[in-house]
Amino acid sequence: MTDNFLSNSSQKQGRLSAWLTIHRLSHRPLGFDYQGVEIVEVRPEDWPSVAVSLYVYGFNYLRLQCGYDVFPGGPLASIYYLTKVQDGADQPEEVCIKIFVSRDNPKIPSAFWIWKSADFQERESYDMLGIIYESHPHLKRILMPESWLGWPLRKDYITPDFFELQDAY
């Protein structure tokens, strides 16, 4: 399943990226963050198989899921920080998975069925950015009212001229 998606990367391949390559899981290494955590890009269609493989490999804790708008009119990103929690591990192994989607069709398979802690985090990304997490059992707004129009954290979002403050007193 590794195709030219992996070969198009000029980044140094880390330990986890090498493991994903050995197991023929499509990905692209993006280097390391400032703390030395390996960053890997995965396509939305490859995310379910990569997520299950990472869980089986030992990444049993979803530390963080968030999303962001890369640039106005550009793609949206969903990020998953996974940790391998083990007994007596003072330096647990971590990985950052980035998934980029088009703002015209922002669909990513949900990680809820693997890491239950993805529930509220994916809902927040949906509420603020409009990323649709397919097969998520409770995908609805979590911070904004259900009647709210648009996605407030998108860079092309236009703030409404008027909105009603409810329960302000």
Swiss-Prot record:
Cellular localization per UniProt: Plastid, Chloroplast thylakoid membrane
Any matching Pfam family: Complex1_30kDa
UniProt xrefs under SUPFAM superfamilies: Nqo5-like
Catalytically driven reaction(s): a plastoquinone + NADH + (n+1) H(+)(in) = a plastoquinol + NAD(+) + n H(+)(out); a plastoquinone + NADPH + (n+1) H(+)(in) = a plastoquinol + NADP(+) + n H(+)(out)
This protein's UniProt keywords: Chloroplast, Membrane, NAD, NADP, Plastid, Plastoquinone, Quinone, Thylakoid, Translocase, Transport
GO process terms (BP): photosynthesis, light reaction
InterPro entries, A to Z: NADH_DH_suC, NADH_quin_OxRdtase_su_C/D-like, NADH_UbQ_OxRdtase_30kDa_su, NADH_UbQ_OxRdtase_CS
GO molecular function: NADH dehydrogenase (ubiquinone) activity; quinone binding
Topology in membrane: Peripheral membrane protein
Name assigned to this protein: NAD(P)H-quinone oxidoreductase subunit J, chloroplastic
Gene this chain is encoded by: ndhJ
